[in-house]
Amino acid sequence: MLSTRRQCQIGVLIVSSVLLASCAAPSTPQAPASPVPAQTPATGARPVEPGQWSLAKAAEPYKGVTINCVFLDRPGYRAAIQLIPEFESITGIDVTWEIMPYENSREKQVLDFTGNTKNYDCILIDVVWIGEFAASGWVVPLRKFYEDPALADPNLNLKGFFPILLESFGTWNNEIYGLPFDNYSGVLFYNRCMLEEAGFKEPPKTWQELLEVYGPKLTKDRKYAFALQSRRGETQSADSFMRMIWPFGGSLLDENFEPNLSSEKSLAGLRFRQELMKYMPPDVVEWDHDETVQALAQGRVAMITEWSAFNAYFTDPNTSKITDCIGYAVEPAGPVGSRPALGGFSLGVSANSSPEKQAATWLFIQWITSEEKAKDYIRAGGVSGRMSAYEDPELKAQFPYFEPLVVSWSKYGNPVFRPRFPEWPPISELIAQTGTEMMLGSISVEEGAKRLDAQIREILEKAGYYSGAKPKLQ
């Protein structure tokens, strides 16, 4: 239960997508350069004599300060809420939060920034908002805090985050603005019992195998082999459209920052999606995460590709009929290999907040994302971005989905899954509209891709990317 002193606007139980990544889009994803400043040690803080720094001591000047956070109604935020009383007890800082639907969270924060209403101190930054929030000056570069020995925990260890998470979720133009907090990868969730009944000992390793071998055997009696959440909106543009072009060698933009959806490899992924629809529920174009997760949990579909954060719904007997049958694997590979979806959020500090609130907010962000609290955060239902937590044998046994998650982040993570520049929201809307029309058959894949390429180029040209007014950053 939320305390009565918390401000809450309860959203839907399972909310929309989160999404992804960085850098100008090459055909083979390349991780951005490490954002950890060279002039600081691996901790991200200046050297401090042993025993000199403590959270309680660092927080003394801010005792009694209240900070307000933007949270979603998802497992990672409920996990943080469980841990917050410990932070408050140590520091005397009062942490409040407002829970809002994902769909409203960007707009509410932008209105707070532009109106200077100062409602939020601890800012929630989706991977695709980092460019907009940073370039607009709405969030504070975190070196202000991690280079201050009074505020920086000597054990901060920025290099302890999975590099792809810190670089994609929290970094823009080589400057860190947020620390990874709610961390996702796409995972193939499957009903092991349904697969075994159909004669399969393991899930498909490739998309082609899913289509040609698994699809026909698992689609019968009003049950389906696969479901791909595709509702118009961010779910269509990211979870469905972008998820399908990358494994086939496609991309939104090419190495020259030109729209690339009409390339043969991008078209191959979109054509494959059309073909796969015969093994999906007929109304899947209307499905969001909620419908997709429930369909697997209730035994109506055999496989889905979804965010790792939804695992709790499959293991809870109150929400799932397949608790003894749930299986996990890396997302299937295409002709160029596996390119699982990458998504998540970082926590940042509002530039509009007072210096006292900024410092208090930093102390909270540093603590809740720390290596010290990572295991507690995971046990409470969160997904930490800290590498060390996933080496714990007890946690690995308790959470078997760790394996595909860590493999995806470490080996297959695609840092350019979706651009993070400020122009993504209007581009996403266009993809959502045309992508839906493609799936419904009201426009051909080829015509839809041609239309999108022209629209995307117009947006990027108007923004100044081709004139040199803006750097070609994603």
Where are the regions a protein language model picked out?
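Short, low-complexity disordered leader/linker segments with a strong preference
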Residues: 1-66, 457-474
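Hinge/lid segment of periplasmic solute-binding proteins
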Residues: 36, 41-61, 127-185, 211, ...
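Long, aromatic- and glycine/proline-rich binding clefts that accommodate carbohydrate-like moieties
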Residues: 37, 48-55, 66, 326-331, ...
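Short, solvent-exposed loop/beta-turn-alpha elements that line the ligand-binding surface or hinge
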Residues: 58-64, 143-161, 230-233, 248-268, ...
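Short, well-ordered beta-strand elements
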Residues: 63-74, 93-98, 121-122, 226
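Periplasmic solute-binding protein
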Residues: 82, 127-147, 156, 163-203, ...
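Extracytoplasmic "Venus flytrap"/periplasmic binding protein-like
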Residues: 82-161, 196-205, 302-303, 319-320, ...
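Glycine-centered hinge/linker elements that transmit conformational signals in sensory
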Residues: 212-218, 255-286, 327, 331
